[in-house]
Every structure is written in C-alpha cells, then in structure tokens.
C-alpha cells in the first residue's frame, strides 16, 4: 500500500478528524522510537520480526512489527480492538 492509499484508508475508515489526529500523532511516536511506545508484544510477524500493538484511543489500536536489522516499521493494521485482534 502506498502512502496515498494509506491516507485514503485512514480518511475513509476514521471520519472523525480528532481520531485521525491521534492516529497521526501515534504514528509519529512509532517513527521516533518504535520500541519505546510498544505496549503489548504479540509474537512475531510472517517474517519473524517482533510484533506489537499500541493504543491510539480506548478502542483503536495500531498493530505493527519492527525489523531491527534494517530499522523498518511495518504497519499491519489500524482499527478497532475487534478488527485488529479479530475478537
């Protein structure tokens, strides 16, 4: 997914501007230090990288993984707790 597609997804999925601002702020935190803000370790992604979840709001989470060797953060899902965790 390109950056433009990601922006469109966020706008379509989260019509509330305040929530989008929280998502943007949380993504900035992840860029600055992805390990510092990891709240919940979830195992490993399909590439063997450690996966984490970070809370954006009470119900919205960002599911991501980190490739520590290449300093890359992969965003797997942004959504409600139910959508991200499937329950």
Residue spans for each PLM region:
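Basic, Lys/Arg-enriched alpha-helical interface segments
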Residues: 1-59, 67-72, 81-87
